[in-house]
Curated annotation (Swiss-Prot):
Keyword Ribonucleoprotein: yes
Protein name, entry field: Large ribosomal subunit protein uL30
Any GO BP: translation
InterPro entries in the cross-refs: Ribo_uL30_ferredoxin-like_sf (IPR036919), Ribosomal_uL30_bac-type (IPR005996), Ribosomal_uL30_ferredoxin-like (IPR016082)
The species this protein was found in: Myxococcus xanthus (strain DK1622)
Source organism phylogeny: Bacteria, Pseudomonadati, Myxococcota, Myxococcia, Myxococcales
Amino acid sequence: MALKVKLVKSFAGASSDMLDTIRGLGLKKFGDERLLKDTPAVRGMAFKVKHLVTLETVSGDAPAPKRRKPAKIALRERAIAYQAKQNKA
């Protein structure tokens, strides 16, 4: 099971706790939607900001979150590729 969480109201003037909760749900701006695993933690976070979000239960699993490479690793890979390109020329 998964939960579709959508930010339907502006969080202007919300307390810092609510802002942290909204960020924790992965919502960044008005109208954002996220498909999250249905866990007690996610339900509790959604309950805390229930006046700002809508919840919808969706069948199936939530997709695994995309992970970015840390900046140091990405920079190192670009440097190695650049050096390899320079050595060929």
